Each structure stands twice: as C-alpha cells, then as structure tokens.
A protein has these predicted regions:
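Extended amphipathic alpha-helical elements
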Residues: 1-142
C-alpha cells in the first residue's frame, strides 16, 4: 500500500531524518540562501509598492487662479524615485533574482515610466508658465 504524500501541514522532523537530510546539508544551505535572497528582494519591492501607493504630487493654484495648477515640491518626489530606481537596479543585479525577475523588471518599467512622465510634465509646465506670462501681458490682452 502506497503512503499518502507528505504535505506541509503533516511534515515533521521525523520526515527530515528519514530523508537523511544530514547528507544534503550543502544543497539545503543553497536553497535556504536562495530563499532568503528572494525574500529580501520581495521585501524591497513591497516597500517600493507601498511607498508609491501613498505618494502624491503636491499641486498648488497658479498665482491666484482657481482653475490652473502646477506641480510643486518635486524634489522629495524625485529623490524618492531615484532611490527606488537604485534599489530596483540592485535587486536586478542580485544572483537571487532569477525566479522573480519578471516582478522586478515590471517595477523597473513602472519607475522608468514615472520618471519619463515627471520629466515631460516639468518641461511642459515650464513652457506653459512662460507662455502664460506672455499671453497675459497687458499689451497682448488689448
């Protein structure tokens, strides 16, 4: 009669001893190191995810208008973005990333997109503010 498969819930120290785990210490150590490395990477990615879930742009009314806004206090956001991009690059360089590479690459793309959007937004905002001043000048309005 065949024994039922061992499940995590029923796995015991006796099962390890019966498998002669002491003969496989090197392999067990490799697996443990890989799992620990993956856990560190996943922890980093989770911290980044949580940070971006709660991060907001700071916007203010442009001059005394009620319907025109601009982004302000961008330095903290840029610092956070650069820090997270470096952390993701560090994760990508880890030897433990192989099995979770797709998740890390996804965050690399997301952060790259955020960076591109912020850069374009700031270029547009600077141009808009410049043109706003020109077209609202007294001699142009008349």
């Amino acid at each position: 009669m065949e024994e039922p498969p061992v499940t995590l819930a029923s796995f015991t120290l006796d099962d390890l001893l019966a498998a002669r785990i002491e003969n496989h210490i090197e392999r067990v150590s490799e697996i443990a190191a890989q799992a620990s490395g993956e856990a560190d990477i996943l922890k980093n990615i989770e911290e980044i995810r949580v940070a971006w879930e709660t991060t907001n742009f700071t916007i203010k009314n442009y001059r005394d208008t009620k319907d025109r806004f601009y982004i302000t206090e961008i330095e903290d956001l840029t610092t956070l973005l650069e820090d997270h991009q470096m952390r993701v690059q560090g994760c990508m360089g880890s030897r433990h990333v192989a099995r979770i590479r797709a998740d890390v690459e996804a965050w690399e793309r997301k952060l790259g997109t955020v960076s591109d959007v912020i850069d374009e937004w700031l270029v547009f905002q600077k141009s808009w503010m410049y043109l706003e001043n020109i077209f609202n000048a007294e001699d142009i309005i008349k």
